[in-house]
Regions:
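Alpha-helical architecture
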Residues: 36, 44-45, 69, 114
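Acidic/His-rich active-site region of diverse nucleotide-sugar glycosyltransferases
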Residues: 1-42, 48, 57
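Active-site-adjacent helix/loop segment of glycosyltransferases
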Residues: 57-153, 159, 164
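Short active-site alpha-helical segment characteristic of glycosyltransferases
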Residues: 49-53, 69
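Glycine-rich phosphate/pyrophosphate-binding loop
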Residues: 5-16, 150-172
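A cytosolic small-molecule/anion-sensing beta-strand core signal
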Residues: 20, 52, 65
Length: 172
């Protein structure tokens, strides 16, 4: 709900896809069973990756509206930096390759590419050429790490206890 007006949409307990690591609590044994945070990520999308792996293994994430957490967004990098942009682009490729059901990944790839093109255009027109170059650098780093991501995918998908349809529905 970051940046959204609170009109009561967050007042109910419910299951959600996952939580920001800055506000999440994980059962220790499950966290370690699934390999903890991917050390190749350093920052950005590590929580999305963990949420995916938990969902794939059949674990649920529960939202409690009474829980309060203060998370200083951007504390790692104060403003959108080239380093942050590069990490986001690189890690997003890994998250998708490691976790998305194969057919969903194929089906969504054209959309992912269009969104990337729009994002890069936005960097060029509304930000700076250095952010654009950082995004491109991150994208190519992500492409270079495809073999590593595919090896991790093999391990992750072995723990899968839910159907592709379940994952597709929870991603909507």
């Amino acid at each position: 709900g970051h940046g959204e007006q609170d009109i009561g949409q967050y007042d109910r307990h419910k299951y959600i896809f996952g939580a920001c690591a800055g506000a999440a609590m994980y059962k220790r044994e499950i966290f370690y069973e699934l390999g903890g945070f991917d050390e190749d990520f350093f920052a950005y999308y590590e929580d999305v990756d963990m949420s995916f792996r938990m969902q794939i293994a059949g674990y649920k994430c529960y939202y409690n509206p009474k829980a309060v957490c203060y998370h200083k967004r951007g504390a790692t990098t104060k403003t959108m930096t080239g380093f942050e942009t590069m990490l986001c682009e690189k890690n997003l490729i890994a998250v998708r390759l490691k976790n998305y059901p194969f057919l969903t990944l194929l089906k969504c790839s054209p959309y992912f590419i269009i969104v990337r093109i729009k994002r890069y255009y936005n960097f060029l027109t509304k930000h700076s050429s250095s952010l654009f170059m950082s995004a491109v650098k991150g994208y190519f780093k992500g492409l270079l790490e495809i073999p590593k991501s595919l090896r991790k995918r093999k391990f992750i998908q072995k723990s899968r206890t839910v159907s592709s349809e379940y994952l597709e529905n929870i991603l909507k």
